[in-house]
């Protein structure tokens, strides 16, 4: 009642202070001392204050939660004003200067938003649990520092949005357009990104352990120093992408197309690679130790000083690749058989057939010296 009377005098600053005081008193009460009826009345008072504030268009107190086409709120649980619970009530927030809506620092649980225009909206610092955004336009939406748990973006436009420094667990981006999006320093554990466009997006130093990337188009994407350990990448198109210093330890890479991309000093240790096609890419100083490569091509790529120790190779093609200073050893049981990089330079194709059955190598130059041929023959004879 005091808050409402203060509103009538347009003394909004005192109202804000009063609400904060009410919240502190409410939080300090022992749970056993609050009956359901008292709890309901307290919530009703907060709602009355919020609705009155909304009529005054004072967005310092109210927050727009979900505005549908009929201008009605459709949400089950919302935390508003320092996480005070509001159940099944309408709280409408005015639009921001850019035409979006301000959800910042709200705790939103179980919301379902479909076919809405949320472009230029602000979710900075939000906590989103079991939230679903479907068929929404979220162009230039700000999720900076948001916390997301089991969130789903389905067929949404996320272009030019900001996901920097978010904390996402078990989130999904399905059939989305996420071009020019900032994901730098984002934590996206066990994220599932599929059928999505990531053109020009920035994942600088993003932590993406156990991520599943499937059918993703990612030209000019920046993954510099990102961590994708234990992740699975399948049917990915990287063109002019930067994957330098990326940690792909114990990851699975299948059907990957890398064209004119950078993988300088990238970690591919203990990684399984199948049908990875690298054309004209810079893979200098890449670490393939303990990796398993099957049907991979490194055509016209730079592998200078790359490491392939304790590595299994099956039908791997180094056609016109630069391999100076490359360190290679082939696994045979528990023994490693070294291959001199100078020998590899003389060959256009290395291991044309399965190492376990093929005992010869195609000669690409008639003048391969006898020493190189003897080393190659010995390796192939005893290769695993």
Protein language model features and the residues they cover:
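Positions within the helices of HEAT/ARM-like alpha-solenoid repeats
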Residues: 14, 42, 62, 69-73
């Amino acid at each position: 009642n005091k808050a409402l009377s203060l509103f009538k005098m347009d003394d909004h600053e005192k109202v804000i202070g009063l609400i904060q005081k009410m919240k502190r008193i409410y939080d300090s009460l022992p749970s056993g001392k609050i009956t359901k009826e008292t709890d309901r009345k307290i919530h009703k008072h907060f709602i009355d204050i919020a609705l009155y504030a909304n009529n005054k268009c004072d967005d310092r107190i109210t927050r727009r939660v979900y505005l549908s086409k009929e201008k009605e709120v459709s949400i089950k649980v919302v935390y508003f004003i320092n996480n005070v619970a509001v159940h099944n009530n309408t709280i409408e927030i005015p639009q921001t200067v850019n035409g979006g809506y301000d959800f910042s620092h709200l705790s939103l649980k179980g919301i379902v938003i479909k076919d809405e225009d949320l472009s230029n909206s602000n979710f900075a610092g939000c906590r989103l649990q079991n939230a679903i955004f479907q068929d929404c336009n979220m162009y230039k939406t700000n999720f900076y520092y948001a916390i997301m748990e089991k969130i789903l973006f389905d067929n949404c436009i996320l272009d030019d949005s900001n996901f920097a420094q978010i904390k996402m667990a078990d989130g999904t981006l399905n059939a989305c357009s996420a071009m020019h999006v900032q994901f730098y320093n984002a934590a996206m554990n066990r994220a599932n990104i599929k059928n999505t466009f990531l053109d020009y997006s920035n994942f600088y130093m993003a932590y993406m352990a156990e991520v599943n990337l499937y059918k993703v188009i990612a030209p000019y994407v920046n993954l510099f120093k990102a961590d994708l350990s234990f992740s699975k990448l399948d049917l990915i198109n990287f063109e002019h992408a930067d994957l330098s210093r990326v940690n792909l330890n114990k990851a699975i890479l299948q059907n990957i197309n890398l064209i004119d991309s950078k993988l300088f000093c990238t970690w591919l240790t203990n990684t399984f690679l199948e049908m990875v096609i690298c054309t004209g890419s810079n893979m200098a100083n890449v670490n393939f130790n303990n990796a398993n490569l099957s049907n991979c091509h490194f055509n016209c790529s730079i592998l200078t000083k790359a490491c392939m120790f304790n590595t299994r190779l099956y039908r791997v093609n180094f056609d016109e690749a630069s391999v100076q200073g490359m360190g290679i050893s082939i696994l045979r049981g528990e023994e490693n058989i070294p291959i001199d990089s100078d020998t590899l330079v003389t060959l256009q194709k290395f291991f044309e057939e399965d190492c376990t059955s093929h005992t010869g190598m195609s000669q690409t130059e008639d003048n391969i010296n006898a020493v190189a041929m003897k080393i190659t023959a010995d390796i192939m004879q005893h290769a695993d």
